[in-house]
Amino acid sequence: MHPTLRTVFNLRQQNENTWKDVTPFPDQDAIHHDIARATFRSKLDMTEAYEKMRIRPEDVGETTFSTIFGTFQSRVMQMGFCNAPSTFQWLMTAIFQDFLGRFVHVYLDDIFIYSQSI
């Protein structure tokens, strides 16, 4: 396994000045119940999921950060943004809305697929 660099940001000050999204998260007990009853189950863990979400062009300026190498802006969602989990959950819920509770559940970057038959 190759070592990889992971960018880490201290976003505490930015998060203190950010409006907090209060999108509700799925009921974990309901997810566990549906999956436990299924004969077949799969779990997909999306790698670096937040970093695959683009930030709206008009909001990129809000992501400015400085390093010893210069000042930069992020064009993708970072793990430390306070609204990253709720934004990502909203997106996954929108994508899978027709299947949620039927044979799919989504909790943040995990997709659970379940059924009684193949």
Segments (PLM) and residue ranges:
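Retroelement reverse transcriptase polymerase core
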Residues: 1-118
